[in-house]
């Protein structure tokens, strides 16, 4: 988990959509009058607001990760591996193949891990075609915010 992020984490589009009228008014003004200052200030405010929201989301994810580590240690100590729990936070869902490849375990063990994590309420399984996805319930809720 100590890798660099290779995708953007500041999504300005939600702020711009929420303030669409102001955005287009200021953008139009830059095109018609050449006045850039107000538009630049708008974008800087968008960056600030989005950064604050992103920091809060990252903090929530970190707290959820820590709480999940504790929950697994307490409720499923036989399957606890920090790498397993961290894998659950790399994306909102896990598949048996992810666990097999990332943790270098047998398919049977990976399946057992995911089913046990579902049993203790961390994951929720969802069948899609032939494959079963295990959704990290709390992470999905955080990402919806």
Listing of model-derived features with the role each one plays in the protein:
Residues 55-87:
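Short alpha-helical segments that sit at the start of domains
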Residues 1-58:
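Phosphate/pyrophosphate-binding active-site loops
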Residues 93, 120, 131:
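Active-site lining segments that contact anionic ligands and/or coordinate catalytic metals
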Residues 80-85, 90-103:
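Short acidic, hydrophobic short linear motifs in intrinsically disordered regions
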Residues 88, 110, 114-120, 134:
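Basic amphipathic alpha-helical segments that dock to polyanions
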Residues 77-78, 125-145:
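Short, cationic-aromatic polyanion-contact patches
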């Amino acid at each position: 988990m100590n890798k660099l992020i290779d995708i953007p984490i500041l999504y300005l589009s939600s702020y711009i959509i929420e303030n669409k009228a102001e955005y287009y008014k200021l953008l139009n003004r830059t095109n018609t009058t050449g006045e850039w200052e107000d538009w630049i200030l708008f974008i800087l405010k968008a960056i600030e607001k989005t950064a604050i929201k992103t920091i809060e989301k990252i903090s929530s994810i970190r707290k959820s990760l820590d709480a999940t580590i504790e929950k697994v240690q307490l409720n499923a100590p036989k399957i606890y591996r920090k790498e397993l729990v961290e894998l659950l936070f790399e994306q909102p869902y896990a598949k048996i193949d992810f666990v097999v490849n990332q943790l270098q375990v047998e398919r049977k063990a990976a399946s057992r891990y995911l089913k046990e994590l579902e049993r203790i309420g961390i994951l929720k399984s969802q069948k899609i075609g032939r494959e079963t996805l295990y959704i990290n319930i709390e992470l999905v809720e955080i990402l919806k915010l």
